[in-house]
């Protein structure tokens, strides 16, 4: 615990839930523990906090719970005399097993265990420091954007599946199924028969109205519409499918509009943060990955002792286990999945845009490593580089890094020399 224990007037363990929170409180210098139940209502939490402020004269109070974000955390941090010490749920579960080997779980007991962990092992816990509003907003926005993208993929896949049952030709005419021109075309001509009844000039005017003006593309699509043969003329297939498509199109449009709106807000937040330039020019990052990487690193540079600690936190560093003569290495399961996904996705995107990343990838593939294993290894390498850039507040320089590899006679350069680009 980075904060001196002696400064706290009381210590609190909380086992949070959706509707109520179990609380276990111990006054500093006392062995007596007080248990209570706190309703999850803003007024109840506020009244509880004000009562504690009055009772202890506004002196600092330490609070331990297995959560670093969420409604209860936001409510607690509204009061400046609380110092929050979040603990990993797996850590608390392991500590619980020390006292209950049977695996029994009880909410009031969990609150007491959180308090016990706070009192007996303060050196294992770090206080939660609230980052500035823009950084905290950015972190929520980029994760929400990824969720909307996932939802859009799900809706698009359902739309494609439905179109394949009666109107598969349209899937060949439009490569990008998430565009407004694709949605507008289906809305106007929801079947091949409808499209074939349209005049050539009407088709051309439609594409021009949606900024598709290349004559070869428009003519090819218009001719294909007239020459294609319907997959089926069965109304029992076509009519239900048309209704399903009509139900999916508004969802697709709403999700696309939501993503555009979030992109605008994310851009505003990024421009307000001084570290954005460290990630904006990374190979293959673009605005989407740059904002996610910025949110992943945050602004608290004393939070991680070194790059290895950060690699473990985001789930890129593997886990090594030993038992007797056995030794095995496996994927790290307990980690923030979105952060790990951020690095895995960006690293894959960096390969076509980074000379050394391409060489690193090719060298590992030449050794027989799988694509996924190679991406994880490359992510491990990239994080070490980015961590140093983040600590030093210096953007990554590809030429400088290549010169460093050459100075160390890195074997990666052999593959870099063979790169056809």
Model feature map: region roles:
Residues 1-421:
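A detector of single, family-specific signature residues
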């Amino acid at each position: 615990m980075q904060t001196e224990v002696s400064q706290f007037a009381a210590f609190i363990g909380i086992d949070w839930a959706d509707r109520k929170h179990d609380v276990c409180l111990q006054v500093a210098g006392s062995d007596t523990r007080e248990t209570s139940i706190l309703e999850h209502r803003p007024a109840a939490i506020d009244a509880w906090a004000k009562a504690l402020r009055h009772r202890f004269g506004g002196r600092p109070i330490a609070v331990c719970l297995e959560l670093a974000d969420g409604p209860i955390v936001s409510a607690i941090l509204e009061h400046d005399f609380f110092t929050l010490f979040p603990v990993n749920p797996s850590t608390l579960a392991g500590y619980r097993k020390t006292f209950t080997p049977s695996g029994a779980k009880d909410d009031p007991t969990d609150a007491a265990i959180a308090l016990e962990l706070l009192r007996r092992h303060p050196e294992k816990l770090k206080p939660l420091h609230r980052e500035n509003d823009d950084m905290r907003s950015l972190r929520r926005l980029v994760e929400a954007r990824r969720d909307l993208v996932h939802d859009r993929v799900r809706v698009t896949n359902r739309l494609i599946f439905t179109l394949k049952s009666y109107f598969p030709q349209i899937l060949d005419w439009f490569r990008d199924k998430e565009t407004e021109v694709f949605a507008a075309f289906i809305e106007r001509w929801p079947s091949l028969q409808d499209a074939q009844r349209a005049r050539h000039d009407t088709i051309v005017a439609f594409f021009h109205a949606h900024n598709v003006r290349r004559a070869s593309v428009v003519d090819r699509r218009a001719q294909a519409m007239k020459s294609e043969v319907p997959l089926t003329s069965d109304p029992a297939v076509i009519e239900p499918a048309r209704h399903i498509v009509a139900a999916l199109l508004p969802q697709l449009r709403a999700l696309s509009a939501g993503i555009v709106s979030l992109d605008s807000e994310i851009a505003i937040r990024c421009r307000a943060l001084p570290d954005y330039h460290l990630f904006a020019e990374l190979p293959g990052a673009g605005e989407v990955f740059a904002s996610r990487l910025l949110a992943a690193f945050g602004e608290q540079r004393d939070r991680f002792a070194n790059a290895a600690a950060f690699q473990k936190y985001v789930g890129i560093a593997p886990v090594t286990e030993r038992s007797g003569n056995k030794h095995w290495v496996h994927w790290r399961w307990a980690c923030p999945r979105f952060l790990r996904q951020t690095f895995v996705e960006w690293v894959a995107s960096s390969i076509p845009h980074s000379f050394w990343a391409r060489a690193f990838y090719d060298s590992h593939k030449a050794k027989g490593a799988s694509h996924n294993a190679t991406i994880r290894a490359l992510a491990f390498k990239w994080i070490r580089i980015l961590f140093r850039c983040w600590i030093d507040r210096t953007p990554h320089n590809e030429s400088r890094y290549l010169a460093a590899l050459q100075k160390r006679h890195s074997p990666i350069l052999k593959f870099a020399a063979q790169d056809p680009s």
